[in-house]
Amino acid sequence: PATPGQAHKDPFHIPFGFALLSPKGNPIPLQLQAETSPKGNARILELTETEFTWTFVGIKEKPVPSLARNFSAPIVVDYDYTNEELVFLSRFDNDAFNRCEAMEALSLRCINEMVMDYERGTRMVINPHFKNAFEAMLTDKQASAAFKAIALTLPSERRVAESQPLINPLAIRAATRALRDQLGRLFSHVIMRVFDENLPSSTYSPNPTDSGRRALRAICFELLLAGGNAKSLLRARQSFETSSNLTERLDASVSYTHLRAHETGRNL
């Protein structure tokens, strides 16, 4: 849009990471109409005009686009993905950035739906697509703990507010808490298993592997507290009391402060 002193603005030069995924999750070889053969499975499309058209040939199945891959430019992509496509990207895209983007998009949709439930006075229910994507990410054996910690982090209340045209702080708070509570209850056993499987080394180290495990355990700890399962609460509290590093104790203290305020004083 026009701004004072600059009525006309030329388009930015935007490098746009792009790929197409087959229904099985495999990258499709990309061949432009003017080319004689495919040039790899991913491209950087150079956007230099307000409108641009590229035509790819040889696409035999309906693909799912993977856009702005690897954070190729600091832009917001406005593409109307279906819930099914977002679940697909969160599970099968070989671009880590876009997997996380798909998880955040699904979680925002889920929370915004729960906000509307709250405003209507109806029961707040988790979107089944987000529930499936969350469980798949939580149990993914190939992903690192550090990656899963990022992908499973739920949007902050501020981030939710930014996605809404009209902000209702009470509804946002209720929806975000309800989502954590329900995830903690639905997946308490799986979360507890992931929590136990990601014990860092006995001797504290800031190396990436142990740091990722601590980050994932912090996510699990928060969800276990939110779910309120008695066995999980006891197990989480024991871990907090016996933790050998300050990072986990601080993470636990923050979780208690935010989610179980009546226990904060005792734990601190």
What are these regions (language model features)?
Residues 1-59, 63-66:
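Beta-strand-rich binding/interaction modules
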Residues 8, 46-48, 55-262, 266:
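Long, ordered, helix-rich scaffold segments
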